[in-house]
Amino acid sequence: CYLSEDHMLGARENLRLLARMNRLSPHPCLQDRKDFGLPQEMVEGSQLQKDQAISVLHEMLQQCFNLFHIEHSSAAWNTTLLEQLCTGLQQQLEDLDACLGPVMGEKDSDMGRMGPILTVKKYFQDIHVYLKEKEYSDCAWEIIRVEMMRALSSSTTLQKRLRKMGGDLNSL
């Protein structure tokens, strides 16, 4: 399983798209800020084993895709940029699917992998609850856009770490 340079370029492009999706000055939204507790698994990949890292990356990208693919999302963003972001996230997921398949086949019920994944799911569940509580307001979406930039930036850092270790995720 190899994450190509194209995969890494796609990750950077997704960050650029998120930056371009900015519609509001962040100042009026400052009172809506919340610490969602970005999971350390997404930030500090050195504590993860190979199969955990792949699973965490996949789950984070899947949850991010799901977040921007909900009905309320299309009302908040430029449709073209949103579609490009979702397409880019989908491509990254497909790239990781090639890595995830063998890992899942080896230890499908491995609870060591489930802890970090559940942490990522809880993180995104908190984001969905926040959006609902804020009635999917423009400010709430702006807060989430910035949060997703942090999350995707962290995932890109983790992907770079994995790639530097020989470029082959299976050799970690």
From Swiss-Prot:
Pfam families: Interferon. Disulfide bonds join 1-99, 29-139. It is found in: Secreted. CDD domains: IFab. Keywords: Antiviral defense, Cytokine, Disulfide bond, Glycoprotein, Hormone, Pregnancy, Secreted. GO terms for molecular function: cytokine activity; hormone activity; type I interferon receptor binding. Signal peptide: none annotated. It comes from the Eukaryota. SMART domains: IFabd. Constitutively and exclusively expressed in the mononuclear cells of the extraembryonic trophectoderm. Glycans are attached at residue 78. Gene3D superfamilies: 1.20.1250.10. InterPro entries: 4_helix_cytokine-like_core, Interferon_alpha/beta/delta. One of its GO terms (cellular component) is extracellular space. One of its GO terms (biological process) is type I interferon-mediated signaling pathway. Paracrine hormone primarily responsible for maternal recognition of pregnancy. Interacts with endometrial receptors, probably type I interferon receptors, and blocks estrogen receptor expression, preventing the estrogen-induced increase in oxytocin receptor expression in the endometrium. This results in the suppression of the pulsatile endometrial release of the luteolytic hormone prostaglandin F2-alpha, hindering the regression of the corpus luteum (luteolysis) and therefore a return to ovarian cyclicity. Belongs to the alpha/beta interferon family. IFN-alphaII subfamily. IFN-tau genes are intronless. They evolved from IFN-omega genes in the ruminantia suborder and have continued to duplicate independently in different lineages of the ruminantia. They code for proteins very similar in sequence but with different biological potency and pattern of expression. This is Interferon tau-3.
